[in-house]
């Protein structure tokens, strides 16, 4: 019988991303929040905003998963910022 070790999400990172306005930070947070994580047992992300700053907290099982997940989220944030620039 093989015993499965529980994976702990002990690799963490917090990003603080400033926006020009509180409204932009709130919009970015709301746009990203519904996105499902494919393997929540390996990688988790929480979004919040305080004034004009979007806070993103990442947790993962290892540094590789953290790097890949963070890279993907940053690409999404970049797209959101570009859309805000075009629409404003």
From Swiss-Prot:
It comes from Saccharomyces cerevisiae (strain ATCC 204508 / S288c). InterPro entries: CTAG/Pcc1. One of its GO terms (biological process) is telomere maintenance via recombination. GO terms for molecular function: chromatin DNA binding. Belongs to the CTAG/PCC1 family. Its main location: nucleus. Component of the EKC/KEOPS complex that is required for the formation of a threonylcarbamoyl group on adenosine at position 37 (t(6)A37) in tRNAs that read codons beginning with adenine. The complex is probably involved in the transfer of the threonylcarbamoyl moiety of threonylcarbamoyl-AMP (TC-AMP) to the N6 group of A37. PCC1 functions as a dimerization module for the complex. The EKC/KEOPS complex also promotes both telomere uncapping and telomere elongation. The complex is required for efficient recruitment of transcriptional coactivators. GO terms for cellular component: chromatin; chromosome, telomeric region; EKC/KEOPS complex; nucleoplasm. It comes from the Eukaryota. This is EKC/KEOPS complex subunit PCC1. PANTHER family: EKC/KEOPS COMPLEX SUBUNIT PCC1 FAMILY MEMBER, EKC_KEOPS COMPLEX SUBUNIT LAGE3. Component of the EKC/KEOPS complex composed of at least BUD32, CGI121, GON7, KAE1 and PCC1; the whole complex dimerizes. Transmembrane segments: none annotated. It is found in: Nucleus; Chromosome, Telomere. Keywords: Activator, Chromosome, Nucleus, Telomere, Transcription, Transcription regulation, tRNA processing.
């Amino acid at each position: 019988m093989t015993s499965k070790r529980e994976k702990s999400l002990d690799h963490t990172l917090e990003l603080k991303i400033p926006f020009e306005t509180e409204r932009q930070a709130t919009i970015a947070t709301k746009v990203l929040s519904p996105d499902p994580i494919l393997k929540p047992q390996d990688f988790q992300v929480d979004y919040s905003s305080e004034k004009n700053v979007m806070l993103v907290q990442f947790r993962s099982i290892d540094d590789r998963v953290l790097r890949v997940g963070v890279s993907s989220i940053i690409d999404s944030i970049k797209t959101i910022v570009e859309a805000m620039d075009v629409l404003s």
